[in-house]
């Protein structure tokens, strides 16, 4: 089955939402920081960006595919209780819609009340049968606040498997080999069995380029990446795994599913995310889109035990523990190394039981 209509709509929705998040950063973070008015604990720009991006994407999805349920991250309760924040979100949503150039007839939200109702349509419980979309409106909130990597992540799941993905990375250089001179902003998109492609975020006329992971066969030549936040994964154990594999260079640390996009185009070869708590369940919107990018670019994605990620059991990956992504040529070696290192650690033995 062709998913071209879904792919094109997903790219357009992610692009529109990315523009809104860039407005939020420039108006509410960059300017405030320059004026010394943004405190370290001020998370309001992320809140505004999250709600605005979710409203933009869901409104377009519901206009194009009204019967598809959506698993989103936010609901409107906070906005209904905070009218000032709601007004700011509504102002940015209106501004973004007015400047839209693609699918202009879609996502025409008429009021703040309609906007909040649309946000609430992301409350689907998930499941294994039929179609559903997953959305993370701003993945990597701390990266967003720092002006580093974050992502707008959208995926279509059919019968428990991701089949369409579009991930917007506004701060990822188009050419990772020339980060200082290459324009920032990409959208990475994939359709199952049809490859992974990189699009320019800001130049809609630029032809997409199919991307592939590096054909690395020796793990000592590979590059591995992990999240920035030490509390999100067992970084010490991950470093031990890298040493076991013969990797001598340090990890690339990056927030959000921009890591998956980077792997897909060959900027890295291995992504390790081992759980810090045995009971932690990864959210499906944090991995659905990114995992498909890597798989369509020549990689394999599983949990730390080599089990495929199961997106059909609700809003979380409750049947999995952690995440490992790697180029197919070295994937089994990475799983073997992970088993060798973690088998000695009671922390992970509890997970395996």
Swiss-Prot record:
Which amino acids does the record list as binding AMP?
Answer: 232, 256, 259, 273, 286
The cofactor note reads: Binds 3 Mg(2+) ions per subunit.
Activity regulation information from UniProt: Inhibited by Li(+) and Na(+).
Q: Does the keyword Repressor apply?
A: no
Chain's gene name = tol1
The EC code for this enzyme is 3.1.3.7, 3.1.3.57
Question: Protein name, please?
Answer: 3'(2'),5'-bisphosphate nucleotidase
Q: What species is this protein from?
A: Schizosaccharomyces pombe (strain 972 / ATCC 24843) (Fission yeast)
Q: Which residues bind Mg(2+) 3?
A: 73
Q: Identify its protein family.
A: Belongs to the inositol monophosphatase superfamily.
Keywords, comma-separated and alphabetical: Hydrolase, Magnesium, Metal-binding, Nucleotide-binding
């Amino acid at each position: 089955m062709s998913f071209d209509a879904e792919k094109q709509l997903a790219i357009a929705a992610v692009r529109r939402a990315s523009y809104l998040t860039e407005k939020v950063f420039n108006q509410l973070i960059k300017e405030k920081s320059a004026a010394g008015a943004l405190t370290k604990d001020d998370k309001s720009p992320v809140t505004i960006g999250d709600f605005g991006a979710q409203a933009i994407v869901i409104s377009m999805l519901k206009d194009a595919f009204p019967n598809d349920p959506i698993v989103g991250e936010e609901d409107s309760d906070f906005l209904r209780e905070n009218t000032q924040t709601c007004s700011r979100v509504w102002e940015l949503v209106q501004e973004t819609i007015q400047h839209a150039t693609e699918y202009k007839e879609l996502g025409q939200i008429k009021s703040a009340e309609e906007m909040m109702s649309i946000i609430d349509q992301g409350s689907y419980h998930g499941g294994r049968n039929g179609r559903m979309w997953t959305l993370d409106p701003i993945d990597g909130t701390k990266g967003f606040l720092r002006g580093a990597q974050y992502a707008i992540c959208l995926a279509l799941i059919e019968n428990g498997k991701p089949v369409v993905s579009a991930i917007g990375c506004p701060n990822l250089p188009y050419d990772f080999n020339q980060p200082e001179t290459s324009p920032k902003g990409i959208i990475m998109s994939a359709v199952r069995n049809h490859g992974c492609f990189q699009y320019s975020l800001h130049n809609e006329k630029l032809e997409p380029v199919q991307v592939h992971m590096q054909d690395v066969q020796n793990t000592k030549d590979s590059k591995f990446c992990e999240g920035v936040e030490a509390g999100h994964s067992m970084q010490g154990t991950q470093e031990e795994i890298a040493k076991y594999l013969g990797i001598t260079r340090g990890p690339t640390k990056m927030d959000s599913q921009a890591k998956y996009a980077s792997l897909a185009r060959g900027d890295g070869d291995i992504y390790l995310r081992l759980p810090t708590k045995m009971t932690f369940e990864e959210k499906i919107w944090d991995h659905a889109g990114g995992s498909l990018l890597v798989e369509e670019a020549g990689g394999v994605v599983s949990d730390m035990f080599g089990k495929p990620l199961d997106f059909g059991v609700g809003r979380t990956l409750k049947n999995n523990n952690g995440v490992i992504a790697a180029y197919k040529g070295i994937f089994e070696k990475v799983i073997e190394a992970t088993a060798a290192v973690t088998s000695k650690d009671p922390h992970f033995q509890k997970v395996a039981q």
